[in-house]
């Protein structure tokens, strides 16, 4: 008797480069029992991104569609509807498109896809012309979602509204801590790259975009307190 094929979840993302949400999804994919479940990705960029080779090596598939810019909204809706009609095997859709999840998940609901996940990874800061679209889409999104995921309370409140807080699943970002285990030989190499020759110098590092959501002011406050105790 032939073994059952794995359940294939369709993940919607802009591009599978090394962003936070994309890295989180890759961590899940790497640790799944891929004989039972796997991810396929529908992206909105036409270039080969950082994670695509690994996705395919792990058995995932990459599909491409037009960008989700305002001038392409009509085209995107037509193409996504046609895609679902051509791929009825997808019974679970996991969207990382924030408020833009409104488009594909509404179409997925119309096409009878039973599990439609919207995942909030962020909350916008400030107001610009895009904010008008964001507000329109996010207010209509919950109607077409079966499962609401969020990385934290603020992100969930923004995308789904505070009234839906009790429905939101706090999906904390999974991290393979073994990748960050202290390695003395690697530490020596990195310190040398930055010209830190004194072995008694305490070194702290941070990787992150200079955006408000990364909360650099809090990191600076922490560093100030650390520096008081370790002035070297």
Segments predicted by a language model, with ranges:
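A conserved, positively charged/aromatic
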Residues: 110, 117-151, 160-164
């Amino acid at each position: 008797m032939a073994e059952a094929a794995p359940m294939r979840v369709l993940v919607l993302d802009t591009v599978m480069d090394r962003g936070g949400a994309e890295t989180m999804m890759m961590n899940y994919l790497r640790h799944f029992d891929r004989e039972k479940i796997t991810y396929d990705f529908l992206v909105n960029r036409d270039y080969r991104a950082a994670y695509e080779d690994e996705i395919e090596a792990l058995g995932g598939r990459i599909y491409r569609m037009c960008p989700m810019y305002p001038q392409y909204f009509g085209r995107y809706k037509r193409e996504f509807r046609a895609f679902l009609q051509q791929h009825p095997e997808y019974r679970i859709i996991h969207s990382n498109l924030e408020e833009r999840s409104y488009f594909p998940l509404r179409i997925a609901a119309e096409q009878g896809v039973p599990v439609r996940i919207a995942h909030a990874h962020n909350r916008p800061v400030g107001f610009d012309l895009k904010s008008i679209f964001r507000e329109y889409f996010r207010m209509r999104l919950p109607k077409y979602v079966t499962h609401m995921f969020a990385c934290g309370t603020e992100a969930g409140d923004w995308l789904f509204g505070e009234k839906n807080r009790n429905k939101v699943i706090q999906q904390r970002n999974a991290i393979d801590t073994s990748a960050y285990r202290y390695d003395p030989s690697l530490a020596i190499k990195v310190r040398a790259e930055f010209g830190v020759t004194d072995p008694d110098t305490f070194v702290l590092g941070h990787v992150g975009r200079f955006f408000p959501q990364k909360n650099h002011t809090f990191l600076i406050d922490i560093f100030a307190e650390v520096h008081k105790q370790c002035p070297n």
